């Protein structure tokens, strides 16, 4: 199998992961362990899944990749709006924006945070108010690239604050691209995130 044929594990839905675990002769509880490593502990490498047997980790590495978006730049800070520029393999770049909520109803600071996520590299629509379409559509983001933005922002926030818990309360797909034009990857990404 060529590296280009290996699918990113974050592009596999729960059903697909169950099928893989079963076909690998592993007990069903391994599915929950793997999901916990991917989405709760937010690992950046399959080797970090230390409660899995080494043989299973090797089998995972032979079957899947785990691509992590590279943070090129962040503007803003941990307590204000932060705009992230991510690079994916191949050099394609997209942005995500972490937006803290305004003051709460009683004038207190709210802990709500919204993440604005990209779904495409560029955009085919060319709306006058938006810079995403200036160079046209380059390509749709894959499922793992959509999901990877959320995980990478959560990890960035943990590095900045020491708080490793989830911080994103709300997702909007209003970053680069038109999300429904990438329906075939958006819906599986939403299923994984849900």
Predicted regions and their residues:
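Conserved Radical SAM active-site core
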Residues: 103-121, 125-194
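Flexible, acidic/Gly-rich N-terminal and inter-domain linker regions that tether
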Residues: 1-113
């Amino acid at each position: 199998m060529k590296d280009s044929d290996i699918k990113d594990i974050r592009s596999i839905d729960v059903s697909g992961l169950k099928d893989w675990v079963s076909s690998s002769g592993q007990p069903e509880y391994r599915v929950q362990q793997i999901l916990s490593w991917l989405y709760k502990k937010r690992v950046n490498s399959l080797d970090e899944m230390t409660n899995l047997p080494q043989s299973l980790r090797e089998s995972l590495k032979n079957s899947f990749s785990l691509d992590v978006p590279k943070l090129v730049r962040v503007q803003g800070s941990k307590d204000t709006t932060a705009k992230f520029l991510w690079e994916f393999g191949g050099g394609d770049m997209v942005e995500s924006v972490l937006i803290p909520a305004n003051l709460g109803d009683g004038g207190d600071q709210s802990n709500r945070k919204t993440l604005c996520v990209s779904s495409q590299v560029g955009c085919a629509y060319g709306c006058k108010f938006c810079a995403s379409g200036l160079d046209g559509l380059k390509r749709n983001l894959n499922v793992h690239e959509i999901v990877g933005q959320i995980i990478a922002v959560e990890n960035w926030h943990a590095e900045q604050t020491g708080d490793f818990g989830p911080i994103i309360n709300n997702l909007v797909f209003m970053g680069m691209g038109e999300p429904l034009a990438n329906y075939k990857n958006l819906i599986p990404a939403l299923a994984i995130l849900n």
